[in-house]
Amino acid sequence: MPRMRFKPLLVCVSLAVGAVNVVAIVQPSRIPRANRVIGLLEHKQPVFGVYWPSNPSGRGRAGAPPPPDVAPKPPAVLAREALAYHEADFYFSGALEGGMDRGYGPVSDFVKATVDALSQTRSRFLSASTPLIVKVPKIGADREKAASEISRALNLGVSGLMFVEVESADEVRAGLAAMRFKSRGGTRSADTGDAPAYWGMSDDRYKQKADLWPLNRDGELINWTIVESKEGLAHVREIAAVQGIGVLWPGAGTLRGVFSTTNAAGERVVDTAAWENAIQQVLAACKEFNVPCGFPATANDIEMRMKQGFSVFVMNWGDAGFKTIEIGRKTGGR
């Protein structure tokens, strides 16, 4: 597919690429940040973001009626909706987690529509441009395939990637290497796809800026890593110790299922004590290794989670998520 050409425009489109250590946080970059998330973390400020708006999948909850037939919104409309909301520090999507081929089209369409919208309203939105961060499929044993998928995602122009279902330190190291160009000691190929166009810079400039923070304190890519299994919890300290993770997350939703059983009536019962212990286990590893810790908060628990030490939050798109961000920003002095 031929590369698209856009007018030079600095768009802070983000994919989870990052590494956090004490030095990186204490010594911020000497240059203005394109990636707002990294800038906030460097100054130890709480970070709040939302899943970007998307069309319904067409699947209702178990036992619930199917969603009503509604004409899907075109990418341009979804992008304008996202950019009209100014309180988010990042936009997030999990569309690629279930498979690159299935999710690539909608993500690519949204990124392109975002760039188009920014270019049409440059003076209004440029200073508030917000990074895009996306999940990628589980790294797993096929490291070559994982590296290819990571490169493909980065070439969209995102600024951050989330590694899902992480269960070992080696898995993280392989993923982080795939986020860095070979010239930086990584395994990412020299191909940059459409990323330079989305970032509004030349190919050479993109390669200079698109490196992993905080391994490179001037890098603009950030990595998020999520632990969401008993195997991952067993190795969470080894995972947290890997240099290059920008934010470590407990997979709260998935872990709720991990610590659930089915009773005699066929109902799912959550062991809330074990679930909370798992969350605190990840948080303790974050604190031990000075890695920011993330959580998918709601209005009911964001103040508590902030007091516990979580500092990066992602909420669902919509009024409930916006209310949660309002509470979080007030609590965090932002």
Regions found by a protein language model. Give the residues of each.
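Bacterial N-terminal signal peptides that target proteins for export
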Residues: M1-L10
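Expand to "…catalyze enediolate/carbanion chemistry for C-C bond making/breaking, isomerization
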Residues: I25-R334
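Bacterial N-terminal signal peptides
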Residues: L10-N21
